[in-house]
From Swiss-Prot:
UniProt KW keywords: Methylation, Ribonucleoprotein, Ribosomal protein, RNA-binding, rRNA-binding
Protein family according to the UniProt entry: Belongs to the universal ribosomal protein uL11 family.
Name listed for the protein in its UniProt record: Large ribosomal subunit protein uL11
Lineage: Bacteria, Pseudomonadati, Pseudomonadota, Alphaproteobacteria, Rickettsiales
PANTHER family xrefs: 60S RIBOSOMAL PROTEIN L12, LARGE RIBOSOMAL SUBUNIT PROTEIN UL11M
Organism: Rickettsia rickettsii (strain Sheila Smith)
Record's comment on post-translational modification: One or more lysine residues are methylated.
Gene: rplK
């Protein structure tokens, strides 16, 4: 049995249970002649149990016969950091100038555990450092060990 020929990949960030044919989903899928309604239904069914509106990075694989498959990744680190710091937006200034909130090292470790499947490391300490770096770039101060 041969595998289907891959036509391309589409990377989108889609809110959980919020896929609609409107931009950016509709135009991205329409260009590759994918059934937009079928994708939206499948995606919304797959994310039904999640908290509505969580941003989910999604990789859509489009095949030559216009069929598709998709892989949902974990939400961005920035989503978790904003949630733990209880802020709505990160700093627009450089990390030394404006601190908009604080997260603990334990928070960063907890986020790293959640993000491990999508990070390019298998070491929890290295993953924690990646998350701490994301926090610093958002204007969050990391307190604790």
């Amino acid at each position: 049995m041969s595998q289907k020929a891959i036509k391309g990949y589409i990377n989108l960030i889609i809110p959980a249970a919020g896929a609609t044919p409107a931009p950016p989903i509709g135009p991205a899928l329409g260009q590759r002649k994918v059934n937009i309604a079928a994708f939206c239904k499948d995606f919304n069914d797959a994310t039904q149990g999640m908290e509505k509106g969580i941003p989910l990075p999604t990789v859509i694989t489009v095949y030559e016969d216009s069929s598709f498959s998709f892989k949902i990744k974990t939400p961005p680190a920035s989503y978790f950091l904003k949630k733990y710091a209880k802020i709505t937006k990160g700093s627009s200034a450089t990390k030394k100038e404006a601190v908009v909130g604080k997260v603990t090292m334990d928070d960063c470790r907890e986020i790293a555990k959640l993000k491990m499947p999508d990070l390019n490391t298998k070491n929890i300490e290295a993953a924690t450092k990646i998350i701490c770096g994301s926090a610093a770039s958002m204007g969050l101060e990391v307190v604790g060990n």
